[in-house]
């Protein structure tokens, strides 16, 4: 009886964890349609769709968690969830992503988070449409990494599946990339403001 009761509680807890993770990970799948619209509006290519989708999903998940967890914790949790999604996809996708592809996705996730945080301090609008337009601008100006061949993906990463190597490289590079992303956004503040204003018309 004790074992049966324990098993029920364990299964309920496991189910709750799966549901919570599913809700948190959902942005990495449900924003594809919004990305489609922005890709079409800007006449972007195939690679831009994936990079824009990752950047937007991370930005939106961060923006959702931010009021509850605060900026730093929301950013960290968004990055961790993005990494967990990549780990799960290693076991569920028909074609397993190579390490360079995984790093590329994590690079774009991080840029989405940094962009959303940057908008909070930029003094402008910080709604979903503005975040979409900002990530779209990043895709259009090649700030996001489109392909595994991108020069911003470390040459040391293999062209074979190696999730551990990709995660380790992304974690190591995160402080440097965050600083570079913020500097890029600051340097192009006026271009971004003009692009968002034009898109809003």
Cite the ranges covered by each PLM segment.
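Divalent metal-coordination and catalytic microenvironments
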Residues: 105
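Functionally important transmembrane alpha-helices
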Residues: 110-115
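Bulky hydrophobic segments
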Residues: 3, 8-98, 116-201
């Amino acid at each position: 009886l004790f074992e049966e009761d324990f098993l029920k509680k364990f299964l309920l807890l496991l189910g709750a964890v799966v549901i919570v993770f599913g809700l948190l990970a959902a942005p990495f799948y449900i924003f594809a349609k919004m990305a489609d619209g922005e890709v079409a509006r800007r006449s972007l290519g195939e690679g831009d769709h994936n990079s824009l989708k990752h950047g937007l999903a991370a930005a939106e998940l961060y923006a959702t968690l931010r009021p509850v967890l605060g900026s730093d914790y929301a950013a960290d949790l968004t990055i961790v969830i993005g990494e967990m999604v990549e780990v799960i996809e290693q076991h569920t996708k028909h074609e397993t992503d190579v390490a360079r592809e995984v790093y590329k996705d994590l690079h774009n996730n991080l840029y989405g988070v940094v962009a959303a945080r940057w908008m909070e301090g930029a003094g402008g609008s910080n709604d979903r449409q503005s975040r979409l337009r900002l990530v779209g601008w990043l895709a259009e100006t090649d700030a996001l990494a489109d392909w595994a061949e991108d020069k911003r993906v470390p040459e040391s990463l293999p062209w074979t599946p190696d999730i551990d190597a990709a995660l380790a490289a992304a974690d190591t590079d995160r402080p440097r990339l965050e600083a570079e992303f913020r500097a890029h956004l600051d340097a192009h503040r006026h271009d971004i403001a003009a692009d968002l204003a034009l898109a809003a018309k």
